[in-house]
């Protein structure tokens, strides 16, 4: 199982006079102000890759925080005003210099992945909200001046409820049309549950759910400490499983998805959060959500 957690570049945070990882919304807003005042307009405490591509982190936290989302039945139980509040919350992070406006990010990077952007590599973007299995990808991308500052942060509780969620990071299955069922089952057993296979797999696709496989991978030193640390924090915070419709490609597709359209419209100034609500709800209803 995997989920999202915050990663921070404490090298940059220290330059801004901040010595501890953000643990609250107040900490994030204070960091945005400190970065702008002490480091300049082109330094930001964090980036939400989820806004332009797959915003399956902050919005569910807003929903669950209010006790309004039902990830089991894919029913949207919140009002237009409440989802506007969620969109306005994300906009407030841009307005508070916590993260870069998407227009500026696209101008500098086009559709380049965040960990490959110059801003991340050089520490100008000093945080990311990402999958626990991606820890080493973001750590190894930093240049030599910033690499030692990479830190697995804490989940930030934005309200009365834990908004964390998890999903399967990788699953293997045998199809009904498989012509070699026994052989396929043997391969899955080898990769996930047997010593040699589990030692090869390690934590490359996330922390193994198999107790036997995890034990073999740990004994072989194949479980990366950063990934294990991040996963433990995510699982301790998680209260919900990911709604399977939330990652529907019509919603999350890069360049064409509803999520990107909504946040682009807000960040480019074409719509207010209140005006963007109908487009988001219409898009979610079109893929199977029930609007209560």
Q: Where would I find each of the regions flagged by the language model?
A:
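A structural signal for short loop-to-beta-strand junctions that line the ligand-binding cleft
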Residues: 1-12, 44-45, 155-164, 240-249
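Long, aromatic- and glycine/proline-rich binding clefts that accommodate carbohydrate-like moieties
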Residues: 153, 202-260, 265, 292
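Short helices/loops that flank or line small-molecule/ion binding pockets
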Residues: 13, 30-37, 110-128, 261-269
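Extracytoplasmic/periplasmic substrate-recognition and gating elements
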Residues: 96, 142-209
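Bilobed periplasmic-binding protein-like "clamshell/Venus-flytrap" ligand-binding domains
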Residues: 37-51, 97-100, 194-204, 287-291
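Periplasmic solute-binding protein
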Residues: 1-20, 48-73, 95, 166-174, ...
């Amino acid at each position: 199982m995997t989920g999202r957690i915050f990663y921070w570049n404490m090298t940059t945070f220290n330059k801004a006079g901040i010595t501890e990882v953000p643990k609250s919304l107040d900490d994030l807003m204070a960091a945005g102000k400190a970065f702008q005042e002490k480091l300049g307009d082109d330094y930001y405490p964090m980036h939400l890759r989820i806004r332009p591509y797959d915003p399956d982190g902050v919005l569910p936290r807003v929903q669950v925080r209010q006790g309004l989302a039902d990830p089991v039945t894919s029913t949207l139980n919140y009002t237009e005003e409440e989802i506007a509040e969620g969109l306005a919350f994300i906009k407030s992070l841009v307005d508070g210099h916590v993260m870069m406006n998407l227009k500026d990010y696209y101008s500098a990077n086009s559709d380049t992945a965040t960990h490959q952007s110059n801003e991340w590599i050089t520490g100008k973007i000093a945080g990311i909200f990402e999958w626990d299995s991606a820890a080493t990808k973001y750590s190894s991308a930093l240049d030599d001046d910033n690499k030692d500052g990479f830190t697995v942060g804490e989940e930030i509780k934005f309200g009365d409820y834990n908004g964390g969620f998890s999903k399967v990071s990788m699953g293997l299955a045998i199809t009904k049309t498989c012509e070699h069922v026994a052989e396929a089952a043997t391969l899955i057993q080898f990769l996930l549950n047997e010593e040699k296979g589990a030692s090869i797999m390690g934590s490359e696709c996330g922390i193994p759910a198999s107790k036997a496989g995890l034990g073999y991978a740990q004994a072989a030193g194949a479980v990366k400490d950063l990934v294990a640390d991040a996963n433990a924090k995510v699982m301790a915070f998680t209260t919900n499983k990911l709604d399977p419709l939330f990652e529907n490609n019509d919603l999350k597709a890069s360049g064409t998805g509803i999520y990107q359209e909504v946040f682009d419209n807000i960040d480019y100034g074409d719509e207010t959060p209140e005006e963007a609500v109908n487009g988001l709800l219409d898009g979610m209803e079109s893929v199977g959500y029930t609007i209560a």
